[in-house]
Amino acid sequence: TYPPVVXATLXRTH
């Protein structure tokens, strides 16, 4: 996973 994706994924998933 990448920096931009981590923030977007964690923010949207959690």
UniProtKB/Swiss-Prot annotation:
EC primary class: hydrolase
EC number(s) reported in the record: 3.2.1.118
Catalytic activity: (R)-prunasin + H2O = mandelonitrile + D-glucose
PTM comment text: Glycosylated.
Keywords, ordered alphabetically: Glycoprotein, Glycosidase, Hydrolase
Molecular function GO terms recorded: prunasin beta-glucosidase activity
Assembly with partners or alone: Monomer.
Protein's name according to its UniProt entry: Prunasin beta-glucosidase 1
